[in-house]
Amino acid sequence: MLEGDLASKMLRAVLQSHKNGVALPRLQGEYRSLTGDWIPFKQLGFPTLEAYLRSVPAVVRIETSRSGEITCYAMACTETARIAQLVARQRSSKRKTGRQVNCQMRVKKTMPFFLEGKPKATLRQPGFASNFSVGKKPNLAPLRDKGNSAVVKPDAEISPCMLHTTLGNEAFKDIPVQRHVTMSTNNRFSPKASLQPPLQMHLSRTSTKEMSDNLNQTVEKPNVTPPASYTYKMDEVQNRIKEILNKHNNGIWISKLPHFYKELYKEDLNQGILQQFEHWPHICTVEKPCSGGQDLLLYPAKRKQLLRSELDTEKVPLSPLPGPKQTPPLKGCPTVMAGDFKEKVADLLVKYTSGLWASALPKAFEEMYKVKFPEDALKNLASLSDVCSIDYISGNPQKAILYAKLPLPTDKIQKDAEQAHGDHDIKAMVEQEYLQLEENIAESANTFMEYITVPPLMIPTEASPSVLVVELSNTNEVVIRYVGKDYSAAQELMEDEMKEYYSKNPKVTPVQAVNVGQLLAVNAEEDAWLRAQVISTEENKIKVCYVDYGFSENVEKSKAYKLNPKFCSLSFQATKCKLAGLEVLSDDPDLVKVVESLTCGKIFAVEILDKADIPLVVLYDTSGEDDININATCLKAICDKSLEVHLQVDAMYTNVKVTNICSDGTLYCQVPCKGLNKLSDLLRKIEDYFHCKHMTSECFVSLPFCGKICLFHCKGKWLRVEITNVHSSRALDVQFLDSGTVTSVKVSELREIPPRFLQEMIAIPPQAIKCCLADLPQSIGMWTPDAVLWLRDSVLNCSDCSIKVTKVDETRGIAHVYLFTPKNFPDPHRSINRQITNADLWKHQKDVFLSAISSGAGSPNSKNGNMRVSGDTGENFRKNLTDVIKKSMMDHTSSFSTEELPPPVHLSKPGEHMDVYVPVACHPGYFVIQPWQEIHKLEVLMEEMILYYSVSEERHIAVEKDQVYAAKVENKWHRVLLKGILTNGLVSVYELDYGKHELVNIRKVQPLADMFRKLPFQAVTAQLAGVKCTQWSEEASMVFRNRVEKKPLVALVQTVIENANPWDRKVVVYLVDTSLPDTDIWIHDFMSEYLIELSKVN
């Protein structure tokens, strides 16, 4: 198949797994997570990814939202429609520990190899029949234990809406338990809704309700994202909930509420409502039992908690107040005339400013007027509409509340009420009535001011959400909008509905009078309808803030309308964040200008460090090949330019100190300058400060993040470092800003820069200048160990070297120099550049450098300091690099003897179950499992390896195949098995704890210390039981991979195949996904169903 056709086919599969489309910046990450490769648009001849997508309209449909976000959708394809349904229903884009954040976001997570989810002691443990047979599918008891338990989903967050632990089995045997799991929409798989009937029947066979075995387990309440659905009638739902609570005056468990709601109204209660009760004090009182359970108790709202903002929309009628003397009406009392009747009803309702139940009207009427209430009056309430307002509850004509239409002056009402009721509680009630009356008067005077309860905006639960930066006045208050289905997409849907409502409803008219703080619907530019809040008012114009966009504007009153409550269920989308690391300079005009120019109007990945009212965040630009830390970029941009070192071409610099030499020949130098002198003085002051001050908790780094600048004590003095990678809560990578050295340290070894020195320290730019030796080929990769060692021995930490600059490459940030030691300056023929080419360090490739020297052309005195290099220089150098390295390896015999291997990892016996994690899945015939109970030990070992090898001296050892070593793979050290030595200086290794095959440079392989040989190797090769297929297509493998990879599961062991080598052990298992609240998904059944569907298509 041609590459273009294959890319189109895989692209269609990726897009079909996202019903709501994929944002353009996320598409590459989603494609790679499924296929392992990037979309090859450049190889196909397109300059950008968007250009390629627009060239395949039969595969991709591109839409641009009002916020400027480009979203890609799959075009319909009849051939793969049925496959797409299966892929879509199992798609999971929420990576738990992958190297990518938010699929496309390559942000360094705080704990990248720490697993999220918690199956240990919480997964449903299966019971087994004693007659287990290896040859057939086991006859299992229900996988979910019966009894009291609070299940923690291993792949999701759990809501606090669980049954209280004091409830026994009998208490909820007949009542369905409602649980709400908050995850991204495309991350959930509901078999009831998406699977075909045969599979639904199978998956529901173990749907026994249960609670957790571990009653004492603490479950953290998550931040729950408000639902995107906001079209339900909030008023009606709130009134129904009040009715339920009024029937249960002694309280009701929140977990039982959905059941009673459905039983009474024949509708399902929107699960997002359960998270908003704490914000509805006018509807209910929420109480958490002191017994420590996760369930909450709901009570009817307390009258004293009624707020003015809620009395408008939630008109709860007070009970009719009895008169001072109650006399039953006489049987022979006269009947009131029709004209007088309406007038008397209007006068009566004034007494009940919070409303009167229609059913209570006859009794109150007869008690007050001593006349008989007309029998047919209640059957025709509409006839009273000209003297009172009628509010029908739940659409039931038998349940209505009557309100006075023309209230009397407020002072008279208050006076009468105080005379009739003297006790304190009644006075409090009258105060509430007075507030209600004020609003009624304001409404009748056309000066209505609306106070509407809007749910607060919840911070997304995903690791690295996308945000659109709107504007900022300082870096502590950056206005942003979250981009995603429950945020920007939900907002656009709401605005479309607002446009339809206000454009086609002739009854809505512009507001006549507004008040500061009032919420409105504003007809903005391009006929868009937006939610807004009044900031100030003028004669014909009002200044409003668009609460979903974060900016303000003056609009005409004729464009402002009363906001309908049904558009208030979605949180205000504009919110604020604080940029981490920039707090001390938050108001600096130069910094604000830089941040504004780099961020406003653009979409970024955001790493949320602290989920406070104003979250502390780091922004990342992920639009290029590398992620750019915006916070760090802005900080570097405002450094004091006068303290920078500006190297001039052909200039000579003396007293230069070489501070670091990398394995590719790159070196870092310090050149004497004003900035270096100021840095030295400042570090001395800090040394004195720490010497005189007792170390407190404020001095330690409590919240490490990438780009943060802090201090590290090294060789008796404090030095500036920048955090470059956070491995875990204990270990991280740092780069010394003023020497270029990179190492791993413990978080506890770092210190905060004292506040009094912080601003000065930030202003000083990094003093390490990146250089390379002129006239040496730059594309040869790693130097030979002997060449690097010779260079280090010659100049490293020598403080009186000299350099001559031949070229400054601004784009790469590197200077090409000639380097001299003190005794050889300024003889050009004795420079380090010439010595390293003449030294016996490249004996296997002398032609690389010796044949490259041209008389005169390479002289430091020449204006053109670049040598002419033969065309095959780099090729020959790379070709012979392996031979040089091998010889070097053999010259340094290893001081490590072959150590004993750790014992094999413990596996359950056939017929038993175990909790596992799947780090790698190729297809059902080959995947890797890790015992969940041991993972925390592996995390500790990984941390210790990072710290140990970051400070250990690099050893040159003779490597052998099929031996165990430590290898550095993507900034982490792993225990590996060497599988082979390639001809390009790389070696193939197998990660013994994670089951991955990697290629690493041979220089990154080190002896495995004895202290890291105790823990058994954690990766165990596995095969899925219960499936007959032996050959798996790429599509089937992709489906399986997305179902199990990076997930905690329950494994039922069928067979264990032992081997002398622990990495050759194999296990055949059934896998069960228990992340759904009431259904266990057997992976082999799911794959069998997929194969059946695939065969129908083919």
Swiss-Prot record:
Residues 893-1098 are annotated as: Interaction with CABLES1. GO terms for biological process: lens fiber cell differentiation; lens morphogenesis in camera-type eye; P granule organization; piRNA processing; post-transcriptional regulation of gene expression; spermatogenesis. Disulfide bonds: none annotated. It is found in: Cytoplasm. One of its GO terms (cellular component) is P granule. Residues 513-570, 703-760 form the Tudor domain. Its main location: cytoplasm. CDD domains: LOTUS_1_TDRD7, LOTUS_2_TDRD7, LOTUS_3_TDRD7, Tudor_TDRD7_rpt1, Tudor_TDRD7_rpt2, Tudor_TDRD7_rpt3. It holds the Pfam family TUDOR. Keywords: Cytoplasm, Differentiation, Phosphoprotein, Repeat, RNA-binding, Spermatogenesis. One of its GO terms (molecular function) is mRNA binding. Residues 861-1098 are annotated as: Interaction with CDK17. InterPro entries: LOTUS-like, OST-HTH/LOTUS_dom, SNase_OB-fold_sf, TDRD7_LOTUS_3, Tudor, Tudor_domain_containing, Tudor_TDRD7_rpt2, Tudor_TDRD7_rpt3. The keyword Repeat applies. Residues 3-76, 233-302, 337-406 form the HTH OST-type domain. Gene3D superfamilies: 2.30.30.140, 2.40.50.90, LOTUS domain-like. Found in a mRNP complex, at least composed of TDRD1, TDRD6, TDRD7 and DDX4. Found in a complex containing CABLES1, CDK16 and CDK17. Interacts with CABLES1, CDK17 and PIWIL1. PANTHER family: TUDOR DOMAIN CONTAINING PROTEIN, TUDOR DOMAIN-CONTAINING PROTEIN 7. Belongs to the TDRD7 family. This is Tudor domain-containing protein 7. It comes from Pongo abelii (Sumatran orangutan). The gene is TDRD7.
